[in-house]
UniProtKB/Swiss-Prot annotation:
Its main location: secreted. InterPro entries: Collagen, Collagen_Structural_Proteins. Trimers of one alpha 2(I) and two alpha 1(I) chains. Interacts (via C-terminus) with TMEM131 (via PapD-L domain); the interaction is direct and is involved in assembly and TRAPPIII ER-to-Golgi transport complex-dependent secretion of collagen. Glycans are attached at residue 113. One of its GO terms (cellular component) is extracellular region. The lineage of its organism: Eukaryota, Metazoa, Chordata, Craniata, Vertebrata. Residues 1-1041 are annotated as: Disordered. This is Collagen alpha-2(I) chain. The modification 5-hydroxylysine is found at residue 113. The keyword Secreted applies. It is found in: Secreted; Secreted, Extracellular space; Secreted, Extracellular space, Extracellular matrix. Residues 290-299, 332-341, 466-475, 562-571, 703-712, 754-768, 822-840 have a biased composition (Gly residues).
Amino acid sequence: SGGFDFSFLPQPPQEKAHDGGRYYLGPGPMGLMGPRGPPGASGAPGPQGFGPAGEPGEPGQTGPAGARGPAGPPGKAGEDGHPGKPGRPGERGVVGPQGARGFPGTPGLPGFKGIRGHNGLDGLKGQPGAPGVKGEPGAPGENGTPGQTGARGLPGERGRVGAPGPAGRGSDGSVGPVGPAGPIGSAGPPGFPGAPGPKGELGPVGNTGPSGPAGPRGEQGLPGVSGPVGPPGNPGANGLTGAKGAAGLPGVAGAPGLPGPRGIPGPVGASGATGARGLVGEPGPAGSKGESGGKGEPGSAGPQGPPGSSGEEGKRGPSGESGSTGPTGPPGLRGGPGSRGLPGADGRAGVIGPAGARGASGPAGVRGPSGDTGRPGEPGLMGARGLPGSPGNVGPAGKEGPAGLPGIDGRPGPIGPAGARGEAGNIGFPGPKGPAGDPGKAGEKGHAGLAGNRGAGAQGPPGLQGVQGGKGEQGPAGPPGFQGLPGPAGTTGEVGKPGERGIPGEFGLPGPAGPRGERGPSGESGAVGPSGAIGSRGPSGPPGPDGNKGEPGVVGAPGTAGPAGSGGLPGERGAAGIPGGKGEKGETGLRGEVGTTGRDGARGAPGAVGAPGPAGATGDRGEAGAAGPAGPAGPRGSPGERGEVGPAGPNGFAGPAGAAGQPGAKGERGTKGPKGENGIVGPTGPVGSAGPAGPNGPAGPAGSRGDGGPPGVTGFPGAAGRTGPPGPSGITGPPGPPGAAGKEGLRGPRGDQGPVGRGETGAGGPPGFTGEKGPSGEPGTAGPPGTAGPQGLLGAPGILGLPGSRGERGLPGVAGAVGEPGPLGIGPPGARGPSGGVPGVNGAPGEAGRDGNPGSDGPPGRDGLPGHKGERGYAGNPGPVGAAGAPGPQGVGPVGKHGNRGEPGPVGSAGPVGALGPRGPSGPQGIRGDKGEAGDKGPRGLPGLKGHNGLQGLPGLAGQHGDQGPGPVGPAGPRGPAGPSGPPGKDGRTGHPGAVGPAGIRGSQGSQGPSGPAGPPGPPGPPGASGGGYDFGYEGDFYRA
């Protein structure tokens, strides 16, 4: 029936099983388990287990995709999807330029007014058509494309460290050196648990053998299927500590899910209590010796040391005696750390075994001959995790892996060079209304405008100047106007003189950092290379060039728009520039041509000045007339009072660029403001890196040879070094090949069938491997149509495809005979002609057009908005502390005499200057200087240029249609019979399909289906161990205890 056989587990005790008048109350001692029998027939599913829930197993490897199954029967209509989000409003198109006014067409000849024809007779009602043939059922639909892989789940909790295994039975020998890691072995199949063997007697104390090198690390085995949890069994005998099991194959990583919206970070939790340190387990059996790694390349020489002080030349002393060998010189410069290798994968946490009793140490025996090689023991429980190995060399770069989850935003880096200018983007929507700006200065008086056309009425006498009205209230802001028509290009004005450079403002605060770029796909793990010897550390080389920019990752699905970020702090306002002097008023432009005035009417007598009436309602705006020539400039009005600053209107669309104005006269330079205070000194920058070593200096004079010193005293052995922190967990290596299948066990005897238990539905196990393709089932009968669901909201419209080509036009029908026109009479209209014949019968309708060729795909949709960055993952748990290293052997070498004093080294060159520190913050804004006095009046400016002609006026309204001219109208001819229907037109081609719309919202989860039929009975379990009880009688019945 597939999967593993769990019939060897002990069955749960029955409440009260009756067997021939006897009752069994309790289990006896557990006997030895016999050899495993062959698997029996599948028995009925057993009752619900009573054990605690086991730890979740590792995810199994995703099986290969099965063959495509046959098309199933048509499914039921799914529930209506959730309403889609409303689409974004389309961008507003740019208003096109005004079209040129067309020429008036030639007026047509007035046609004759025809006589109204008679109404046609009503057609006969057709008989109802025969019912259509019932269509055959449609073919079953194909399976849809598989959905996207869900987001990768969070990593599971780290397994607990297993308890130490039972104590070994060997004598206490010293631990030998750990050999290098061997090659990775192939993964074996998951073995069945063996029966616990009898407890062996304590053997004689053997001699301590040499510690072998560490064995090869096993490959990762296939993850086993989690079986049902059985009842707790009796504690068995203490087993031997087994070798470390192979790690399982890593599960296939799912495709990255869509990044969710960024959540609000919660408060930082309190630090948890430090857990108790686990006991170090017994070391496992030694493996075969691995191959030695290659020797690393020696590092380059370190930088030259500082020169020593120049010693005085001493007197030559007597030649001393030949001294004994000197002590070992100081160690050389420590080499740089070798390239970091990929650390091995963590093995799965073992089951916590019972702590074995410590055996008593036997007396130290006489060293005997080397014993025979023992057989490998049964694999036992997993030992404690070993110390981390030495870092290996960096493996070759792997292939690109799937895109990882986006990291958190990093700190803003240094400002890079300016990139190339990007392409112009689409016109964005108007931004939010900004704060009201400072009130602007009063502008200079503009040039006189062009005079409008003179009114049609007679020109009246000028009225008396009215009383100046009061200040009006501020009106509400009007709606934003549409973009105006582009005006004609003006003539280019003269280039003005460059203005004087203003005082640079203070540096503003740096703006917020830009969004972080998308992370490229991660590379696959490279193979672990052999660990090389650590070379001596060379000098730091110059920084290498920047690497190539990674290619952008795959564009993810459009994420939902996140909330608007808070705006950055506004930069400090720069110091005000020196105000320029007011330029001279230019001369009045040339007076335009005076329009032709109409004839003056009779001048009326001036009336009395009436009281100002109420303001009338604003009338409809008439159409703009053609612009007339420029009139004379009117007198300058009195300056009005300055109104209050109104609210800022919405941003309008940018109009066309106007013609360049004339440059104003150069103003005089104002007085210089007081000097601002110095800003706060910025923090000191980081110390620069050490410079390259300088050239060797000249050799100093030779020093005298000193006397031989007394022999040194042997030092004490050094203390054991502290264990360094464990390295971070490495990337899991590639899965190894699957191992060979194990031998089939013996078949067990058939057990009695237990009662059928009705347990609750357990948690779903890991997905099994895809089964073979089943036979194609017959299509089921279609179910009744479901009730229509509520109307869903319209989805976002897809991009329209290209329009299909138009079908060919059908041949025109034959025109009916036209009646002859009557003679053109001269007298009164003739009598009305007789009505035409009965209209002809309509022809049969043509056949439906054939489907056209499929259109090409529409253009691709635009990229969606980038999703929010994911939050940073939680920090991993710290690794276990490694065991302390053994103390080194004590030195025995003889004590040497003092060596000769070395000559002073050459003087090193000075290192490069360190990098500049960051710019200090801007100092406080200086006090504003006094306002400069007005400059002298400048020379008179040049006369202004003649204004441009006004824009062409809009075309006037069309005139009314003229009356028909005189002339007699002839009688209408008789109506001809209806012509026959034309042949049916050809089939039009099918239009192009639109582009695929966005994926709909995931439908609601379906309800649970009915329970399936009961499975076949499982294989019977082995007979239970003998209880070992005794029988006793009570009230005529026998009981067993």
